[in-house]
């Protein structure tokens, strides 16, 4: 199965801002990390307003938030957190983030660390009735709970694999093509351990019988095995490059400098709009699954905003937010309330397109997936190894 036969559920996308693109912007200056320091103290904000500090991918724009507020009774003041888990955790632990923001949105994996340090609070599911509509497998994501309590409300889910040009490589179904010597110089991976390490680990575990237990959370020995494999292939000039950011990733495919690479699904749709026969591969080894969770910051509880924060989390699952986010980003909020909302508001959203996006994501998760972890136990070792690869 490929996406070639699937009609484009993103035909009305107004923005292809990706979940990692904000990291690029942060690299241009300190603005993404310093933005909170210029804000008013939380006590000066409107009583019915929630400061939502999350990846830019979760933003639905001023018009979207206006409708959201009218329907939910919660006014959202959105601030981009830069998307990189490291600085976000640092600002919560040692900075002023908990003094300013109420609710966060972040790649799954940091919840355990934040909960253990008392920086976030557990959700009371009794105050989030729409939680019952969340797809069951999304509720079971291990990152979302700690000591039996839910700290992350699943807000966006997807699963990544490979972008391929059919006229160059035909139909591919294994990550092995990324490391195939016949394609030396025509493959690529992302310059980010959070994605490239797990892709490689998934391949080695399933196709090379490597002794790897959990590709998303490698032991020191497992990580060494994976990184030595990548470094060897880099030295052998297997990869055209380790790409960085949306624009470079898209250009590599659009210019056909790279024929197959691991990457983000929206690149496929953007490349198709440029006339390329491009598809998203279905790897026999399994997908890299990821999630954005909504987290309740401890500062909001201390300020008496817990009830309003729960109202926000419930509204994320009510249908409008999922429809709007799907239209803007092509990512799915894991609830069938999206389809019900689109059906009731067919002038604003195409019910068929909303359903198609949901079914497309569900189909991925019906197969083999391995969860990305934004904060594996050895994350500092990951950083060290990745720098070694860059220098190789």
Regions found by a protein language model. Give the residues of each.
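N-terminal secretory signal peptides
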Residues: 1-21
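N-terminal export leaders
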Residues: 18-35
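Early extracytoplasmic/lumenal segment of secretory-pathway proteins
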Residues: 47-113
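Extracytoplasmic ligand-binding site segments that recognize negatively charged/polar headgroups
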Residues: 58-62, 105-111, 115-248
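A bilobed periplasmic-binding-protein/Venus flytrap-type ligand-binding module shared by bacterial periplasmic
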Residues: 161-168, 202-203, 291-305, 324-327
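Periplasmic-binding protein-like
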Residues: 223-233, 274-298
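Mature extracytoplasmic/periplasmic domains
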Residues: 296-366
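Conserved C-terminal helix/tail region of periplasmic/extracytoplasmic solute-binding proteins
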Residues: 359-392
